[in-house]
Amino acid sequence: MGMTESPQTSFTPYQPKKGETYMGEPQKEHFRQILSAWRDELSAEMERARHRMQDETVNYPDPTDRATQESEMTLELRTRDRERKLIRKIEETLDQIDSGEYGYCESCAAEIGLRRLEARPTATLCIDCKSLAEIRERQMG
């Protein structure tokens, strides 16, 4: 699993206290920390990649070497673009935490659940709605 799919930062799984409210302040803070660390990690990786790309830009005389370098750069730029989009999604998710919308399925309003959110903190659908969406996607081709 790559950095763009879920956070790499290790964290202690959240253990709700008996009778604790779903998405109360302690849970929101738990996910705020996970998402902020993930965003910072992605930003740092993008910065490292930018420096790497600047340092590695060489004007190779051999066309094959140039082609290899260009395809590596294209792949790197695609990865950076995915990371930029993910950072935007993380920012939107942090806004959802602040507005009180976080943790609830945008399709059926059910609780998404702590374990699913820890596995995929930017999830906006509960597992049932996500499964249904994937089935529909496969049927549509």
Question: What spans do the regions from the language model cover?
Answer:
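Interaction interfaces in information-processing and related assembly proteins
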Residues: 2-99, 137-141
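A generic structural signal for ordered secondary structure
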Residues: 97, 109-111
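Flanking scaffold residues of small Cys/His-coordinated metal-binding clusters
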Residues: 99-103, 121
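Short, cysteine/histidine-rich loop/knuckle motifs that typically chelate Zn2+
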Residues: 106-108, 128
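Short Cys/His-rich "knuckle" micro-motifs
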Residues: 115-119, 136-138
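Cysteine-rich micro-motifs
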Residues: 123-130
